[in-house]
Amino acid sequence: MKKKIIILFLFTAILCSITLCGCISFEKTQIGNYNIKNNSCINSNVSKNQTIQNVSDKIVNNNTNILNTLNYEIIAYGAFGEKNRGYYYYYKDNKTIIVINLEEMPTAGYKIKIINITETANKITVYYKVIPPKEFAAMVVTYPYIKLSVNGTYNVECKEVR
């Protein structure tokens, strides 16, 4: 009887360790021309005295011409942004803060990758790409978003690169 309990315990421990190992991801974060200031999954709200301009998404092809690329800083990103797809921007401390929201995604693991930010005549264009999960992901509804800042005040246009 004691031998059966030990075998059952070992079988349960092995089964649990195999299940938990499948949940661990060894994916490394790629860091380009930007600094990650805060990597927590928060969605901070905009105060009432800041102006927000809602704009709809536009989609472009990969063959865009890049003239003047700006540096940027990622302030926050995560899986629980706003429910509606689109972007908005506002100004704070001589910086333009840009928030890009994806629509409802059926699983975890979707990411927004910033390709580049170009400047033309006091207007910037943010080119981004939606990266789907590479492996199996948890079946949970998410609303991916990214919040970034650029030095200076600009009108903003965001375009998804496919």
Curated annotation (Swiss-Prot):
CC annotations in GO: membrane
Residue stretches spanning the membrane: 5-25
Major location category of this protein: membrane
Intracellular or extracellular location(s): Membrane
Pfam families recorded: PrcB_C
Membrane topology: Single-pass membrane protein
Tagged with keyword tRNA processing: no
PROSITE patterns documented for this protein: PROKAR_LIPOPROTEIN
Stated name of the protein: Uncharacterized protein MJ1373
Organism encoding this protein: Methanocaldococcus jannaschii (strain ATCC 43067 / DSM 2661 / JAL-1 / JCM 10045 / NBRC 100440) (Methanococcus jannaschii)
